[in-house]
């Protein structure tokens, strides 16, 4: 049986089995009879767990199977809750001395014995139903009606009826034929979310260029392909016949290679899901040097890369823009692009916003509206807009869309399905941070390790189940979004599994769209917009809720004392009128693992958290929190501590040896810096420093002991020169180093050891040619900010210039260079991936420059160039920090404003250089 953690389908059976085993240990001192019952429970639940996993792999379950699955899953939750309460009662009793502690233990044992009896009866009932109805014998035998494949219609759609196809069609043809005279086999992979029109695009391109080839074929592969049939279909297309004796993969591959040996062919392989399928298919694609072409379509990024890894390209299909979406939508409903009644325009735009440019979604919803007896009914249109998830579940007109969404979901592993469903917790259109999601998944028990959770996030991106929202400075995905239709699908699935409950304005107890039957709420997402919605929960039981997520006015937040067994607590509050609300109750939430609070004052709460022994992640955002935080009030096993930068940290930080993330605290006590060296597991460190020489003496020794550090960011008061110059050896896994307030005389020698460094922000006194060469050796760099206060003179030529030679900085995408004059020179081949260039300079020093952005035309990927020109030299120097006014390395000190002529001269020189660029990057020149 595959190992599962907490799962949407199986509930908490996996951790439950471990806890039942733990109860048998001597320290709990249970009676022999109770231990016997626990062993029996464990055996029964283990058998049920195996069947639940089997059921989870079955696409269609009958009602009997679904009902049994739901009851066993809910039973597992109830059993784990019982054990957790018992263990906490024993811990509380241990904390009491003498007779009182003994009585508490006796009471706890009595309660667990009674509860075990009750649970055993329920388990035996479930086991009896399993045996009586022989549920495992029917697994896989039930099958719903075959879903219509929307790709079939895509193959026979007339080009004249398509919208927004011309530009992607031309681009795909360009990629296919860009090396028309090249004899090698050329593969272009089209990749994108389900329903984006990949099949339609591939078919249109196939039809447009097929006359240029000797033979063509168009075949579909699908999720669970019969590769003999796929190969037969290819052979049928290029040869016209398939003898019956060719019925094995190897025979078909050999015949295809023979047929294609001397032909220029065009083959479209549609809907590939695995690299294994591609690896077999490509064996039949003869590399005959006749200029053959292959188009593949897939939802999965890795598969697209594998298909086009040699002599090929990946084309990521884009959603329709607003205009084309509207044209397609209105044409399907009203048979005209201009016939939509004025009264429906706003709701039409609202529906299209949910579709987000996905053609299949637009056509599916349009068909639903077009087939309604009152096509112009505003009430019906608004109902579709507001309750699309319900329509998705039951309306035949949306069968295509439901099928496409379910294909991607059903392809996920059990763990990935759970992680995917969890995204429905967040409000619509949320930008979801990866690091936050990773911490939540671990806290919920879906994943054991954060590294595994990060790989799951990447896999969901790779499979196009979620959309990238933003990248960080290192070029890694920082956040994601969920397509509105996918969110509706997730909410529908989660309701089926009673995985989470979302409520917005209407009471939960009256909202059948978010709860299933009489099952208890396990994860609750409360999303409110105004203070009139403060009774939506009514009298619903909340003690068993494992995850509570709140977005809304503080007055609407329920009492936290009602959430006895909560593990994950997220409070995003606005319009708060009170100081503390019910925050002191948090200290009694003994299972709390993740706590994030935004918009509330937490001064008193932060003094009461040391009893939360399971707490791993604590994040406080905003809320006017300031003052001091003594680390002795924090749980010693905390992994992540993120607090506002105006909250001062003090105490023995070294006792928190499990800490992995420490973000943003205000540091004025040198003891904190000295204690950092004990945090051997620390990976991300971001400090707001305020100190003098004692800080400089304490910081480096501690950093030298942090071997696991991945990211270091310092902010605040500028420290002395070269306080980090002797950081030897630096942590070899470091990928971010942002130390603008720790200036260096020159580029330190140790920086060449940082092979994984992707983001670097530093301040220098001098940048000679050797310094540029040292920085260029960091081939992984994606983001670079360089602020030079002194001299950049080339000692060999005496020119004031920084030359970036060919092949330097191969992966750099963002560069900020601050020096008195924009004296960068780019040779051909330098910075081939640079997209954004920002220059900060001073108009008064313009006469010193020997070159102004010379060779900028060689930056082939440049998209945007920003130039900040300071009229006042002292204002320019102040941007460097408290040592900026100290003259070093031949610096010039200017006190007067630069003449208008100098400013205009520099603007003209910069504009002239940038205008040479053939790619016409966007240009912004700002004067300060």
Feature names for model-found ranges:
Residues 1-29, 100-101:
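Membrane-inserting effector segments that mediate pore formation, membrane fusion
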Residues 20-23, 28, 45-62, 234-246, ...:
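Non-catalytic, charged helical/coil tracts that couple and regulate nucleotide-powered enzyme cores
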Residues 24-93, 355, 827-834, 846-849, ...:
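Extended, amphipathic alpha-helical segments that serve as helical scaffolds
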Residues 75, 82, 88-97, 104, ...:
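Surface-exposed helical/coil interface segments that assemble multiprotein signaling complexes
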Residues 122-196, 200-214, 220-223, 233, ...:
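N-terminal flanking helix/linker immediately upstream of nucleotide/cofactor-binding cores
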Residues 45, 97-194, 200-204, 295, ...:
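Regulatory and partner-binding modules of innate immune sensors/adaptors
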Residues 257-259, 265, 288-289, 503-522, ...:
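Cross-kingdom leucine-rich repeat
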């Amino acid at each position: 049986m595959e190992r599962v953690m907490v799962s949407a389908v199986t509930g908490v059976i996996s951790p439950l089995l471990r806890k039942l085993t733990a109860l048998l240990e001597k320290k709990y001192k249970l009676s022999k009879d109770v231990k016997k019952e626990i062993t029996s429970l464990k055996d029964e639940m283990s058998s049920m767990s195996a069947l639940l996993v089997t059921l989870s792999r079955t696409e269609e379950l009958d009602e009997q199977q679904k009902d049994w699955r739901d009851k066993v899953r809910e039973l597992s939750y109830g059993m784990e809750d019982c054990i957790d309460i018992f263990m906490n009662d024993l811990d509380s009793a241990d904390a009491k001395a003498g007779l009182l502690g003994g009585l508490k233990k006796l009471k706890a044992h009595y309660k667990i014995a009674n509860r075990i009896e009750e649970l055993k009866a329920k388990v035996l009932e479930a086991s009896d139903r399993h045996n009586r109805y022989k549920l495992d014998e029917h697994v896989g035998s039930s099958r719903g009606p075959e879903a219509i494949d929307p790709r079939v219609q895509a193959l026979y759609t007339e080009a004249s009826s398509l919208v927004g196809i011309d530009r992607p069609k031309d681009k795909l043809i360009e990629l296919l034929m860009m090396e028309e005279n090249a004899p090698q086999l050329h593969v272009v992979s089209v990749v994108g979310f389900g329903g984006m029109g990949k099949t339609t695009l591939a078919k249109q391109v196939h039809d447009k260029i097929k006359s240029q080839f000797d033979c063509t074929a168009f075949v579909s592969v699908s999720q669970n392909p019969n590769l003999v049939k796929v190969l037969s279909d290819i052979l049928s297309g290029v040869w016209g016949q398939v003898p019956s004796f060719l019925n094995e993969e190897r025979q078909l591959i050999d015949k295809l290679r023979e047929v294609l040996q001397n032909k220029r062919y065009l083959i479209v392989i549609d809907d590939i899901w695995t690299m294994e399928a591609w690896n077999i298919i490509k064996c039949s694609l003869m590399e005959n040097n006749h200029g053959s072409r292959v188009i593949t379509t897939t939802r999965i990024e890795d598969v697209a890369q594998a298909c086009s890894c040699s002599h090929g390209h990946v084309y990521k299909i884009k959603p329709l823009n607003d205009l084309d979406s509207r044209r397609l939508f209105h044409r399907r409903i009203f048979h005209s692009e201009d016939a939509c009644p004025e009264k429906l325009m706003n709701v039409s735009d609202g529906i299209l916003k949910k579709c987000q440019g996905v053609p299949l979604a637009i056509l599916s919803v349009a068909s639903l509206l077009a087939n309604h007896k009152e096509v112009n009914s505003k009430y019906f249109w608004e109902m579709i807009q507001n309750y699309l998830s319900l329509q998705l579940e039951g309306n035949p007109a949306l069968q295509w869309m439901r099928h496409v969404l379910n294909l991607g979901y059903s392809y996920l592993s059990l763990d990935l399905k759970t992680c995917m469903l969890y995204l429905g917790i967040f409000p619509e259109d949320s930008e979801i941070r990866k690091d936050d999601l990773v911490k939540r998944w671990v806290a919920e028990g879906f994943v054991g390790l954060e590294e595994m959770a990060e790989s799951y996030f990447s896999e969901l991106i790779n499979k196009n189940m979620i959309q990238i929202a933003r990248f960080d400075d290192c070029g890694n995905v920082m956040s994601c979004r969920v397509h509105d239709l996918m969110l509706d699908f997730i909410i529908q699935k989660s309701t089926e599994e009673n995985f989470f409950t979302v409520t917005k304005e209407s009471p939960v107890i009256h909202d059948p769209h978010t709860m299933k039957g009489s099952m208890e709420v396990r994860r609750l997402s409360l999303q409110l917009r105004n203070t009139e919605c403060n009774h939506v929960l009514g009298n619903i039981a909340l003690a068993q809720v494992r995850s509570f997520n709140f977005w809304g006015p503080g007055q609407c937040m329920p009492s936290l004392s009602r959430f006895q067994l909560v593990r994950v607590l997220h409070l995003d509050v606005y319009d708060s009128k009170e100081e503390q609300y019910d925050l002191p109750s948090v200290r009694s939430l003994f299972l709390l693992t993740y706590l994030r609070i935004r918009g509330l004052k937490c001064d008193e709460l932060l003094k009461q958290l040391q009893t939360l022994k399971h707490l791993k992640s604590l994040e406080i955002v905003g809320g006017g929190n300031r003052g001091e935080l003594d680390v002795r009030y924090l749980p010693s096993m905390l992994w992540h501590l993120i607090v506002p930068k105006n909250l001062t940290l003090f105490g023995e930080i070294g006792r928190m040896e499990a800490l992995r993330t420490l973000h943003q605290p205000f540091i004025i006590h040198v003891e904190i810096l000295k204690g950092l060296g004990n945090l051997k597991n620390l990976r991300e460190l971001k400090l707001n420093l305020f100190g003098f020489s004692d800080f400089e003496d304490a910081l480096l020794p501690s950093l030298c002991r942090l071997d696991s550090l991945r990211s270091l960011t310092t902010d605040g008061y500028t420290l002395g020169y070269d306080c980090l110059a002797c950081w030897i050896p630096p942590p070899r896994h470091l990928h971010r180093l942002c130390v603008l307030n720790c200036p260096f005389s020159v580029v330190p020698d140790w920086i060449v050891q940082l092979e994984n460094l992707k983001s670097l922000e530093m301040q220098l006194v001098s940048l000679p040619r050797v310094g540029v060469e040292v920085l260029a050796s960091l081939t992984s760099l994606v983001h670079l900010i360089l602020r030079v206060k002194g001299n950049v003179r080339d000692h060999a030529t005496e020119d004031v210039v920084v030359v970036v030679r060919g092949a330097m900085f191969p992966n750099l995408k963002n560069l900020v260079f601050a020096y008195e004059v924009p004296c960068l020179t780019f040779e051909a081949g330098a910075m081939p991936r640079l997209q954004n260039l920002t220059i900060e300079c001073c108009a008064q020093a313009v006469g010193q420059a020997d070159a102004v952005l010379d060779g900028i035309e060689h930056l082939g990927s440049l998209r945007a160039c920003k130039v900040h020109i300071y009229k006042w030299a002292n204002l320019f120097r102040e941007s460097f920090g408290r040592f900026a006014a100290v003259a070093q390395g031949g610096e010039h000190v200017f006190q007067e404003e630069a003449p208008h002529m100098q400013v205009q001269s520099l603007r003209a020189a910069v504009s002239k250089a940038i205008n040479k660029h053939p790619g016409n990057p966007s240009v912004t020149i700002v004067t300060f």
